[in-house]
A protein has these predicted regions:
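Catalytic phosphate/nucleotide-handling subdomain of diverse soluble enzymes
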Residues: 55-116
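Active-site/ligand-binding loops adjacent to catalytic centers
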Residues: 1-43, 89-116
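Glycine-rich beta-alpha junction loops
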Residues: 6, 29, 51, 76-81
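Generic beta-strand/beta-sheet core signal
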Residues: 25, 46-48, 75-77
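Substrate-binding/catalytic subdomain of NAD(P)-dependent oxidoreductase enzymes
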Residues: 44-56
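Intrinsically disordered or highly flexible coil/loop and linker segments, enriched in small
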Residues: 43-44, 65
Length: 116
């Protein structure tokens, strides 16, 4: 099993134990954040990193509103040079937010159950 899959158990446990929280970041918000980061830092972030950047921006804005001072840490997992097609779609307005419906999720879970 690749290490990336093994880490999900640890992350899930940290979430369950209250050491971290999960947030919902839509695709367009994540690319907004990625482009802002690229303009500010000169690094085009990988799309998966853009979600962390967006959550960091949200948290920083909350601190700005409340006056709270805190250290905010995020993980930049890599550059986005391999996935420039996604940035091209975003910048040309062709990228949309997509959400699975509950029915889609249930259908996929049912199919996974049939694999056992």
């Amino acid at each position: 099993m690749p290490a990336a899959y093994a880490i999900t158990v640890q992350v899930s446990q940290l979430l369950k134990d209250g050491y971290m929280e999960a947030v919902d970041i839509k695709q367009l918000e994540s690319f907004d954040a990625g482009c802002l980061f690229a303009q500010a830092e000169g690094i085009i972030p990988a799309p998966e990193s853009c979600h962390a950047i967006a959550a960091t921006i949200r948290e920083a804005n909350k601190c700005k509103e409340t006056g709270e001072e805190k250290v905010i840490l995020f993980n930049l997992s890599g550059h986005g040079l391999i996935d420039m097609a996604s940035y091209d779609k975003y910048l040309s307005g062709d990228l949309v937010n997509y959400e699975l419906t509950d029915a889609d999720i249930q259908k996929n879970l049912d199919e996974i159950g049939n694999l056992a």
